[in-house]
């Protein structure tokens, strides 16, 4: 196996953030090439191996090479036998992708086959599913803006990284658990401010809700447990060389208890010289 080169295959849904990712990788020193037909990837890598000094290489593969997708999965398996490689898959939920296409007004790669953008997105998910199954990392960018995605990619692949990039999400179980969560903490056992009439329409960023949640003995104990665990776990992630970690804290609706806890844990992580990305999914 050739350990002199590190290769990142960047793939995923159109509108998922692949362009931002490739540009960020280029900014941190990767040699990047996009939309390379899978049949010539091995030949391309062989040329780089012989004639260039690039150590880090990123290759974009997406639905635009649809006619080669069946070969792409086999190709990746072959590359993994030769090079140190990581497959990064970027995705987002349908509503987010629809909004991004509405904002950019760019045509979807499958728009020539499907007049309905919903159908194009559905078909793309199906076509790319085999690549998704081969991926080493899957990033859901639904709640990330371009700046946050750049920060995440830099933290994952930049030479300067020391600590893992941490994303911390508040959510409501009513709408499901975040698909990309590595650690999940369930706060539904804590007293619920939703049932206090004066607090029902507020959220965890409002001081009355925050004061109510944080004065509970259960909350104090729970926060202590989470902080102690994360202090221990983050040091382990550093030793492991883990690039990023997504922490999710949930309550029933995702508007009160989980929001308060996420803000508290984010402040604690900042005290450890970490810079977490905070997402309140259901606010």
UniProtKB/Swiss-Prot annotation:
InterPro entries per record: P-loop_NTPase, RapZ-like, RapZ-like_N, RapZ_C
UniProt-recorded Gene Ontology molecular function terms: ATP binding; GTP binding; molecular adaptor activity
Protein source organism: Thermodesulfovibrio yellowstonii (strain ATCC 51303 / DSM 11347 / YP87)
Protein name: Nucleotide-binding protein THEYE_A0235
Keyword GTP-binding (UniProt): yes
SUPFAM superfamilies to which the protein is assigned, alphabetical: P-loop containing nucleoside triphosphate hydrolases
Ligand binding (ATP): 12-19
Keywords assigned by UniProt, alphabetized: ATP-binding, GTP-binding, Nucleotide-binding
Reported function: Displays ATPase and GTPase activities.
Signal sequence annotation: none
Similarity remark: Belongs to the RapZ-like family.
A Pfam entry, by short name: PapZ_C
Superkingdom of this protein's organism: Bacteria
Residues reported in the UniProt entry to bind GTP: 62-65
